[in-house]
Amino acid sequence: MKKLIAILLVLVMVAGLVACTPAQEGEKTIAVIAKGETHAFWQAVKAGAVKAGEEAGYKVTFQGPTSESEVPNQRNMVQTALNNPNVKAIVLATIGTGFVDELTTAFEKKIPVVEFDSGLYANGADITEGKDPTIGLVATDNKKAGALVAENFYAYLKAQNVLTNGYKIGVIQHDSTATGIDRAEGFVEKINELAAADSITLDIQLEKKQNNAGEYKLALSSLKEWGAQAIYMTNEGVVNEVYPEVKDQVDAYKSILFCGFDCGTNQYEWIKDGGATCALLVGSVAQDSYTIGYESVKLAIAKLEGKEVKDVGIGGAWYTKENIDDLKDKNVFYMG
């Protein structure tokens, strides 16, 4: 009996020790909450984010709603991250307003928030004054990316020996938001600068349109009537309207040289055509989604390590018929 009592006492003591031992801390985590998840763009962002986490010993989770209208769903994702004791930082791009409470909670819990891609909806309208948890933005520098298009397109025009005073370049700007303005201005400023260095004065006409069906086709037609010799398109939406017109009216547009922005199936088909059946798409700039994901997580980690942080602008990647498949394999260029 005494032996049994002794055994029971030992078991009770062991149980007490186990109960008093604090739960083992889980893996330190950075939660990435995007505007989507399944699209190739977001998958490339995810790959970059996970890689940055692995390099620094952090687990990276990645979530996004199935559509950009599911604000409540995305709010739940943010709330779940905030309630997870292992989450040390959040990387966030919101699809609408309604995140006031979540951002305030992040501030109060001292969880830094990195904005990425388009950042917080409506330029951070949900941030409460004095309770801002955001530490920086990682996104495409649209002006820099527009300038990258200009540098490469100008080099092509110069190599083809087609540049003369008064050479006509049209620009189809996709809307009047900062994105459209910066992509157009970056291109125009840089290509004028390069031309001036060669003592050439270009004639540039800007067609500024909204994202309404048919408007980009009208802009294309207007630039053709004006006598455009080259045309720059500021996003995938413009390309998706222009390409079918260029294919259907080969003779009307065959002599015009094109350059663009973003990715997508139409740009892939057009650029791979190489001018064989319709006007030539010389090249375009893709947003470097992999690097956006990578640098976003790196920024969060730097803050957690007590380092000074600042916004990171990503310039994009120029692609042509020659390197488009390589960028596709690296998840920089995406279809869809």
List each language-model region with its residue ranges.
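Extracytoplasmic "Venus flytrap"
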Residues: 29-53, 61-79, 94-97, 172-182, ...
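Hinge/cleft segment of the Venus flytrap/periplasmic-binding protein
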Residues: 171-172, 288-336
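Short, solvent-exposed amphipathic alpha-helices that sit
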Residues: 41-56, 145-149, 179-199, 241
